[in-house]
């Protein structure tokens, strides 16, 4: 009855046409606030500001150096260049002055680095300069200046940015006139700053478009790597032609493609209007903000202290993944010929020009606004019904558990199709539910090979792996290791599995809780407690039968919710499915195979890397993971195991297509509706962003229930398999209790204990800054997974390898895998295969070196089956 109801809801979700949330006509992403005015410069009676100053942040202090202005009355004075340096420390309203540059200069580029503010080029009234120097704010509250290598050419009205320690400079003019604008592109690696002989500027290939000055140079992540973006600018064709050519184009430079010797530049979308002499700044994970443009749009009275300037004050946002541009607000003041800097989580725009000849001493701080979400009663009601239903399943099956065979294996009375859905659900976590669409959204279908490689491997698992576990009638997978090798290997494997699964439970509860808290009004700890407590309740009461049946229901819920989201996204397009295919094809989002066999392909997503890595990642859970192996034993015979594999494979294939399609649909949806993006969300949270703002009330609750379902299915599999291993491999192995009822009570207690422990660890994640330390711990334990699988394969496919050789092989696999991860850039996808291979090869070779006492392995090796 429950299953039919869930199916009905799934179909209902699919046929109802979603109504997108209303889109606001005027977006406003930024909250503006004013900072202390820039003081009067040397020789001037009042603060009037400067244009073209070097601006940057170092040691949590804002530095403004140099610049040029006109004193009042503006129309009767000549431009003045300045050498003043002013510093404003964080949380202070008092400017610190009295510092000087070596000479008066303006209109260079500046970029903030951990080494200091790099000041590049510039000019004065007579000429341009190639000077480059570093300004540092030290602990003694003084400015320290360090000279750096000069530019290859004199350059002013240029712009700079960084990727890591590398400074990039693009655009600018070689002389004082605009007709000297260049197509220059240089870089310098500041990591070599302590090696003066190695520190130098490198000439890079220029973009294919026009030469330019007064452009923006910015860096941002495009879904695959951090790239350089050249935006807008202006140039003059010749000295005789005084007209400016204004630019609205964007070009992207890929450092990875350049390093590989490939064409590195790509033409991107055009801006809605030309921009020049303005500043830009990367925000979030994939946006670049463009502040105004030096195009006169408003009249102003120079004597009016409240005027907002006469240039364009619109703020544009360029999204590097969808290659779209939208207007996202308006500046309070039309500041041009200045530099935007990041100061902690804020963007600071200091001084600048607001009209021809008119500067401003005002400094404005912009903070990103985050839209609040309201989950609503309808969504909460749907989620509550789902959660209560899961507890009801546990209560129902509680009365069917008479002994440990019922609790751990469901009395082997579970249907094959339900066991198959349980295998699928155990492998699919809510991290996958969120992460796979996000990965496809920012890239393409290259990773689909990892998921589909299970199809040719499943027959191997059924024919060559399952028979060993069925023959010994295993409750714990690690019983096989004792029978084939020795008790030490069994206990070592069991203990490692328990540690890994406890940590995995904590992560599987914590990471989805972060996403769920953004979609609901619940806090992260509340989301963790809901997942943990409810899962522990139905697992403790109902045993494996409750786990398997809730897995089956959860599979239908999560796939139904996912299908509905896909339907809403495609339905939002004017052209429907055909437009979806068209936009996705234009963006190469269906690209699935990377035919790269070069020497460096081992570091990439090359097809052969995906195949070999996919084989290892598939073998590990199906050969050595108790949570999966346990499902082989919940049905009554081998034929039903085969049918469960067929069900699992079909469900996995369908889910793969759905989730990869969702990732592509997210790209298409946000390319068609870029105004619905929120820069405060990370790319990994793009699916939760869609769920939060684009789904109607009530139906959003079903999708949230799907995410909970994915989390609970993984947690339930972990907590129940831990209980199975502890009772079977430790308590029963050493006959710690006397009655079957005692073992059943111990099983329930272990389920409760380890489920609670995993929940507590997840709560610690949410309340303490130990995430990186814990991830390192899990990474170390994760090194055991490949070699652990290798132990089983050594036992099943060799007859000469004994316990000592097997242990040496496993330890060698861990060490080799650690070295590979620490000292190479090999794609992490290959880690599982590398660990398996190292364990098998070393273990087999050691069997020729170490003589071991022969033991009866009849039925435990392929040679004696």
Regions found by a protein language model. Give the residues of each.
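Bacterial N-terminal signal peptides that target proteins for export
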Residues: 1-8
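Generic short N-terminal amphipathic or hydrophobic helices
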Residues: 2, 14-15, 856, 861
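Short, intrinsically disordered low-complexity segments
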Residues: 3, 89, 210-211, 233, ...
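Bacterial N-terminal signal peptides
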Residues: 8-18
């Amino acid at each position: 009855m429950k299953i039919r109801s869930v199916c009905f809801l799934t179909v209902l979700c699919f046929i109802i046409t979603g109504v997108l949330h209303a889109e606001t006509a005027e977006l406003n992403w930024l909250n503006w606030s004013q900072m202390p005015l820039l003081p009067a410069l040397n020789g001037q009676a009042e603060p009037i500001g400067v244009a073209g100053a070097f601006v940057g942040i170092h040691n949590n202090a804002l530095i403004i150096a140099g610049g040029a202005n006109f004193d009042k009355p503006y129309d009767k004075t000549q431009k003045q260049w300045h050498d003043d340096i002013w510093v404003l420390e964080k949380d202070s309203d008092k400017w610190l002055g009295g510092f000087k540059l070596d000479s008066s200069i303006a209109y260079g580029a500046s970029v903030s680095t951990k080494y200091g503010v790099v000041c590049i080029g510039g000019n004065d009234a007579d000429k341009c300069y190639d000077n480059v120097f570093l300004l540092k704010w030290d602990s003694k509250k003084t400015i320290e200046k360090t000279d750096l290598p000069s530019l290859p050419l004199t350059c002013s009205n240029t712009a700079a940015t960084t990727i890591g320690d590398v400074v990039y400079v693009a655009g600018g003019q070689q002389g004082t006139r605009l007709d000297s604008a260049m197509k220059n592109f240089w870089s310098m690696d500041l990591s070599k700053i302590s090696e003066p002989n190695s520190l130098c500027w490198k000439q890079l290939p220029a973009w294919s478009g026009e030469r330019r000055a007064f452009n923006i140079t910015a860096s941002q992540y495009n879904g695959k790597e951090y790239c350089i973006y050249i935006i807008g600018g202006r140039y003059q064709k010749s000295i005789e032609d005084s007209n400016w050519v204004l630019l609205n184009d964007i070009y992207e430079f890929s450092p990875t493609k350049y390093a590989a010797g490939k064409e590195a530049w790509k033409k991107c979308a055009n801006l809605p209007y030309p921009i020049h002499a303005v500043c830009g700044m990367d925000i979030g994970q994939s946006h670049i903000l463009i502040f105004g443009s030096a195009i006169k749009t408003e009249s102003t009275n120079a004597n009016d202290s409240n005027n907002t300037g006469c240039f364009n004050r619109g703020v544009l946002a360029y999204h590097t993944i969808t290659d779209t541009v939208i207007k996202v607000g308006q500046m309070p003041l039309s500041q041009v010929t200045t530099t935007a800097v990041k100061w902690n989580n804020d963007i600071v725009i200091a001084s600048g020009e607001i009209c021809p000849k008119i500067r401003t001493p005002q400094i404005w701080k912009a903070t990103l606004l985050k839209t609040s979400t309201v989950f609503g009663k309808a969504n909460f009601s749907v989620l509550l019904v789902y959660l209560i239903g899961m507890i009801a399943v546990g209560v129902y099956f509680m009365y069917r558990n008479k002994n440990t065979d019922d609790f751990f294996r469901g009395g082997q009375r579970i249907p094959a199709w339900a066991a198959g859905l349980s295998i699928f659900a155990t492998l699919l976590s809510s991290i996958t539910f969120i992460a796979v669409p996000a990965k496809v959204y920012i890239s393409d279908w290259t990773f689909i090979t990892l998921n589909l490689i299970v199809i040719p491997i499943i027959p191997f698992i059924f024919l060559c792996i399952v028979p060993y576990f069925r023959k010994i009638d295993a409750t714990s997978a690690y019983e096989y290791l004792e029978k084939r090798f020795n008790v030490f290997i069994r206990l070592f494997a069991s203990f490692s599995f328990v540690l890994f699964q406890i940590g995995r439970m904590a992560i599987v509860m914590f990471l989805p809780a972060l996403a769920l808290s953004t979609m609901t009004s619940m806090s992260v700890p509340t989301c963790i407690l809901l997942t943990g407590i409810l899962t522990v309740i139905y697992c403790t009461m109902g045993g494996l039968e409750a786990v398997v049946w809730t897995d089956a229901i959860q599979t239908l819920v999560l796939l139904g919710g996912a299908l509905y989201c896909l339907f809403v996204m495609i339905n939002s397009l004017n052209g429907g499915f055909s437009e979806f295919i068209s936009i996705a094809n234009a963006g190469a989002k269906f690209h699935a195979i990377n035919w790269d066999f070069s020497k460096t392909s081992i570091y990439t997503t090359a097809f052969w890397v995906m195949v070999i890595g996919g084989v290892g990642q598939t073998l590990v859970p199906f050969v050595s993971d108790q949570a999966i192996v346990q499902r082989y034993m919940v049905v009554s015979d081998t034929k039903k195991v085969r049918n469960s594999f067929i069900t699992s494979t079909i469900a996995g294939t369908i889910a793969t297509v759905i989730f990869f399609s969702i990732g592509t649909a997210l790209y298409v949806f946000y390319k068609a509706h870029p105004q619905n993006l929120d820069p405060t969300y990370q790319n990994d949270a793009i699916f939760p962003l869609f769920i939060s703002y684009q789904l109607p009330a009530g139906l959003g609750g079903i999708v949230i229930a799907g995410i909970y379902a994915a989390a609970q299915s993984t947690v339930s599999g972990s907590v129940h398999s831990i209980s199975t291993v502890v009772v079977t491999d430790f308590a029963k192995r050493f006959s710690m209790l006397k009655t079957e009822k005692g073992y059943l009570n111990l099983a329930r207690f272990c389920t409760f204990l380890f489920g609670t422990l995993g929940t507590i660890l997840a709560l610690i994640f949410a309340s303490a800054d130990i995430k990186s330390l814990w991830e390192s711990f899990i990474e170390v334990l994760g090194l055991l997974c490949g070699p652990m699988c290798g132990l089983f394969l050594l036992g099943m496919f060799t007859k000469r390898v004994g316990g000592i050789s097997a242990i040496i092989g496993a330890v060698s696999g861990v060490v080799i895998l650690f070295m590979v991860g620490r000292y190479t850039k090999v794609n992490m996808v290959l880690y599982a295969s590398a660990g398996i291979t190292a364990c098998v090869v070393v273990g087999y070779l050691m069997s020729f070196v170490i003589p071991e006492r022969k033991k009866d392995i009849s039925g435990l090796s392929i040679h004696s089956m």
